[in-house]
């Protein structure tokens, strides 16, 4: 049975994001993934080095004029017979709620772990987010060219801390200065390590069979024997790879390598295109939308603000769920029930980013937006429904915001509410006083808000510390019990930007006590947009 051209395009797509702790090697992996996909011939351009290369595309020129850096937000590259969309998840200083929300727009994630350190804090948090939709996870144990922890120990740690079974696909032979390569458990092949630097991919020598004398000759008898002994253990103690369990988010295939040495990344990409799902169905408030449907649907998961005060426009990122986008198409913005013609959407295509006029499920479109689009907005060809599963996340950092000029309270509130609708920050107004508390997931969000309040609303604001550790949205089916809860906890309740009631806890202990005291009240860590 031959698929229609449209369904062939859908079947080719793989959309994924990378989750890792800062410094586990995400940027390097991103570079090398693009290198193996031939999207960039000189690794390093991800960081924007070699500016002469950037002048080729007029799309970049437009970006420079507008001061929006959206180049690396979505990268598309071909690999084997697939088209892969890699969505960037800002890590270091620019970590924000957007990082969490991006994970709601992909069909699969690659978890990168520094094999010298194991599971770290940020990885735990990001894994919790992928659990909301049981997203399939592939794992890459990175930095094998350094001294690493015992590989079995690393697998145990992933299983115990992240509650996901590990199925090793490749297994390392030595590490650090003694790193010799990896053995592929399912192909019965050993790939010998030669360091490739920058954009050179070395020809890898392959030894067939675990008991091949060539293996002993290549890695030394001791390491070859150690490998055989370890594999006995591994086969007895770890999970076998099972595609169904992988797609259900219950086990993760594990690959070992060194991104810096250009080694092992291709094994992982082979697994990604072979096993990761093509664009998945998605739930709305009325029905499930299949990627194979011919009518266009999509949802906005992120809005990138412009830091250049001369240009107020922002780019809304929309994940295509079904149907084909064509330039000049008329789409309905469901929340406002207005039809809009989308003629200048940015498409992120391999290589030439300017002239592509179509996009398919799994692809990401950038929509120009002057404040009319919100996070979670659904676009359709007329059907009135809203995609679910694009939440607000409970902030982890809080500050009180105060005006330099007290007469501008109204503008401040308006600005904060609009910024919260856009997803830049969350705002809480305590019921018992006139404070305004701003909540964020990353520190950068606070700076962005102050500079945008000044440039867009002409309001000068400063922050003060506030005694808030965390927030939870609260609801209760029993109205009488809810009233009692509200009466007794008035000093710790606040309304967010959308007038939803939240409990503001001064410490995690305080939150736990409240949860124990009021078992009928639900305390939610996320809230639908």
Swiss-Prot record:
State if Protein biosynthesis is listed as a keyword.
yes
Gene Ontology molecular function: GTP binding; GTPase activity; guanosine tetraphosphate binding; translation release factor activity, codon nonspecific; translation release factor activity, codon specific
Q: Report the subcellular localization.
A: Cytoplasm
Which positions does UniProt annotate for GTP binding? 20-27, 88-92, 142-145
Q: Is Protein transport set as a keyword in this record?
A: no
Q: Which GO terms describe its biological process?
A: regulation of translational termination
Alphabetical keyword list: Cytoplasm, GTP-binding, Nucleotide-binding, Protein biosynthesis
- List, alphabetically, the Pfam families matched: EF-G_D2, GTP_EFTU, RF3_C
Matches recorded under Gene3D superfamilies: P-loop containing nucleotide triphosphate hydrolases, Peptide chain release factor 3, domain III
A GO term from the CC aspect: cytosol
Using the UniProt record, give the first listed, main subcellular location: cytoplasm
Q: Which InterPro entries match?
A: EF-G-like_DII, EFG_III/V, G_TR_CS, P-loop_NTPase, PrfC, RF3_C, RF3_dom_3_sf, RF3_GTP-bd
Q: Where does the record place the tr-type G domain?
A: 11-280
Q: Which PANTHER family match?
A: PEPTIDE CHAIN RELEASE FACTOR RF3
To which protein family does this belong?
Belongs to the TRAFAC class translation factor GTPase superfamily. Classic translation factor GTPase family. PrfC subfamily.
| UniProt function note | Increases the formation of ribosomal termination complexes and stimulates activities of RF-1 and RF-2. It binds guanine nucleotides and has strong preference for UGA stop codons. It may interact directly with the ribosome. The stimulation of RF-1 and RF-2 is significantly reduced by GTP and GDP, but not by GMP.
Q: What is the name attached to this protein's record?
A: Peptide chain release factor 3
Q: Specify the taxonomic lineage.
A: Bacteria, Pseudomonadati, Pseudomonadota, Gammaproteobacteria, Enterobacterales
Gene symbol here is prfC
């Amino acid at each position: 049975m031959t698929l229609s051209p449209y369904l062939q395009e859908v079947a080719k797509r793989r959309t994924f994001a990378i989750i890792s702790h800062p410094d586990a090697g995400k940027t390097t992996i991103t570079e090398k993934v693009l290198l193996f996909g031939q999207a960039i011939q000189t690794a390093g351009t991800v960081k924007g080095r070699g500016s002469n290369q950037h002048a080729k595309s007029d799309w970049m020129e437009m970006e420079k004029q507008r001061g929006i850096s959206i180049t690396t937000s979505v990268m598309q590259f071909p690999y084997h017979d697939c088209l892969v969309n890699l969505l960037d998840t800002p890590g270091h200083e620019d970590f924000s709620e957007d990082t969490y929300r991006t994970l709601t727009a992909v069909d699969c994630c690659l978890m990168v772990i520094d094999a010298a350190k194991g599971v770290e804090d940020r990885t735990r948090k990001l894994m919790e987010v992928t659990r909301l939709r049981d997203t399939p996870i592939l794992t890459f144990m990175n930095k094998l060219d350094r001294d690493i922890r015992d590989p079995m120990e690393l697998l145990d740690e992933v299983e115990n801390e992240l509650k996901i079974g590990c199925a090793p696909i490749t297994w390392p032979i030595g590490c650090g200065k003694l790193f010799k390569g990896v053995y592929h458990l399912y192909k019965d092949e050993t790939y010998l390590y030669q360091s490739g630097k920058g954009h050179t991919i070395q020809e890898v020598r392959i030894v067939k069979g675990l008991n091949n004398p060539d293996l002993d000759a290549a890695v030394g008898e001791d390491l070859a024997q150690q490998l055989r002994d370890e594999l006995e253990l591994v086969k007895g103690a770890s999970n076998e790879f099972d595609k169904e369990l992988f797609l259900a988010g219950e086990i993760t295939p594990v690959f070992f390598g060194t991104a810096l040495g250009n080694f092992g990344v291709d094994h992982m990409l082979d697994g990604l295109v072979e096993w990761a799902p093509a664009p998945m169905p998605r739930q709305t408030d009325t029905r499930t939308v299949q990627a194979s449907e011919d009518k266009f649907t999509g949802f906005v998961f992120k809005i990138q603000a412009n830091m250049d005060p001369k240009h107020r426009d922002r780019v809304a990122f929309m994940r295509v769920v079904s149907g084909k986008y064509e330039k000049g198409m008329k789409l309905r913005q469901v929340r406002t029930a207005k039809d809009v013609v989308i003629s200048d959407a940015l498409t992120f295509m391999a290589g030439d980013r300017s002239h592509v006029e179509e996009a398919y499920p799994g692809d990401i479109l950038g929509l120009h937006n002057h404040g009319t689009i919100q996070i979670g907005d659904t676009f359709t060809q007329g059907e009135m429904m809203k995609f679910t599963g694009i939440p607000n996340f409970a902030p982890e950092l809080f500050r009180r915001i105060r005006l330099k000029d007290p007469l501008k309270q109204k503008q401040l509130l308006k600005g904060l509410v609009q910024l919260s609708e856009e997803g830049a920050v969350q705002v809480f107004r305590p019921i018992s006083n006139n404070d305004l508390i701003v909540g964020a997931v990353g520190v950068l969000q606070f700076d962005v808000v102050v500079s945008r309040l000044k440039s867009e609303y002409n309001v000068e604001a400063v922050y003060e510390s506030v005694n808030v550790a965390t927030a939870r949205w609260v609801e209760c089916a029993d109205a009488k019990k809810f009233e009692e809860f509200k009466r007794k906890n008035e000093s710790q309740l606040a309304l967010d930007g959308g007038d939803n009631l939240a409990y503001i806890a001064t410490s995690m202990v305080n939150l736990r006590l409240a949860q124990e005291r009021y078992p009928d009240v639900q305390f939610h860590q996320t809230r639908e947009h």
